[in-house]
Amino acid sequence: MAFQMVTQYAHSPEDIDHYNTDELRQQFLMAEIFVPGDIRLTYTYNDRMIFGGVTPTTTPLEIKLDQQLGVDYFLQRRELGFINIGGAGTVTIDGTTSDVAPHDGYYISMGTQSVIFASTDAKHPAKFYVVSTPAHRAYPSKQLAFKDTLAMPMGDQAHMNKRTIYKYIDASTMATCQLQMGYTVLAPGNSWNTMPAHTHARRMETYLYTEFGDPNTRVAHFLGTPENTKHIWLEPDQAVVNPSYSIHCGVGTTNYAFIWAMCGENQTYDDMDAVDMHDLR
């Protein structure tokens, strides 16, 4: 097993104003997430979220970050959520094993001492997209079947943003310390996500772009302040960090899906500030 965790520091809008393309990608993009047999994580100082991919093949994988986090075990002071976007797999939580079908997920409580990920078929491995945030108390762990998610149709064909938002971890349906997580699927023939744009000063957010409608699909993701936007081109299964001051929207050459995850001081989903189209630069 290879384990890799990189650190991305927090930056002010004035800092990123001077970044060239390579610098912007280095500071906000996670390019390699699902590597067979590996764990690939990013620790962003934006609200101290840890996110990335766990891709077990022949051997189960466990995230161990006690030394890096100054704790006795990974989730001693953290909670964790994941969504499986690969083949069938299992997760063993403190000795209890559960099946995890494609597109199913899990919320795992602070205080959980062992989380072991495995694939049912090594030739078609599970791809666990994991997100962990700081926690102050333990809430019950919960298995999250895709069929039970809260589905929200959004947008329309005329604006090329017809999509369905599937809420997995949401304050309206379950208790967490701060983690929110979901999966958005664009309908065929649609390309824009989160447009009109918004910001939410009390939360940061990561996007994992996945399930592209065509192998050659690419997504241009926009971030930065509304009056000074930047863009990053993403390939399948790449993720981007959006600071709390930043817009976060994208447009693809065909349809696609993405997993969003948020954390911060406010869990109200609608706590956001809309950006007028005339203000975008």
UniProtKB/Swiss-Prot annotation:
- Where are the annotated coiled coils located? none
- Would you indicate the residue range of the signal peptide? none
Instruction: Please name the GO terms that the record assigns under molecular function.
Output: 4-deoxy-L-threo-5-hexosulose-uronate ketol-isomerase activity; zinc ion binding
Pathway it acts in?
A: Glycan metabolism; pectin degradation; 2-dehydro-3-deoxy-D-gluconate from pectin: step 4/5
Record-level GO BP terms: D-galacturonate catabolic process; D-glucuronate catabolic process; pectin catabolic process
Q: What class of enzyme is it?
A: isomerase
Keywords of the record, alphabetical order, are: Isomerase, Metal-binding, Zinc
Source organism, top-level taxon: Bacteria
Q: Name the CDD domains for this protein.
A: cupin_KduI_C, cupin_KduI_N
Task: Tell me its cofactors.
Answer: Zn(2+)
Q: List the Pfam families.
A: KduI
How many cofactors are bound and how? Binds 1 zinc ion per subunit.
Q: Which InterPro entries match?
A: KduI, KduI/IolB_isomerase, KduI_N, RmlC-like_jellyroll, RmlC_Cupin_sf
E.C. number, please? 5.3.1.17
Query: Which reaction(s) does the protein catalyse, per the Swiss-Prot or TrEMBL entry?
Result: 5-dehydro-4-deoxy-D-glucuronate = 3-deoxy-D-glycero-2,5-hexodiulosonate
Q: Which residues bind Zn(2+)?
A: 198, 200, 205, 248
User: What does the record give as the function of this protein?
Assistant: Catalyzes the isomerization of 5-dehydro-4-deoxy-D-glucuronate to 3-deoxy-D-glycero-2,5-hexodiulosonate.
Q: What family does the Swiss-Prot or TrEMBL record give for this protein?
A: Belongs to the KduI family.
The record's PANTHER family line, in alphabetical order, gives:
4-DEOXY-L-THREO-5-HEXOSULOSE-URONATE KETOL-ISOMERASE (PTHR38461:SF1)
Q: What is this protein called?
A: 4-deoxy-L-threo-5-hexosulose-uronate ketol-isomerase
**Originating organism:** Levilactobacillus brevis (strain ATCC 367 / BCRC 12310 / CIP 105137 / JCM 1170 / LMG 11437 / NCIMB 947 / NCTC 947) (Lactobacillus brevis)
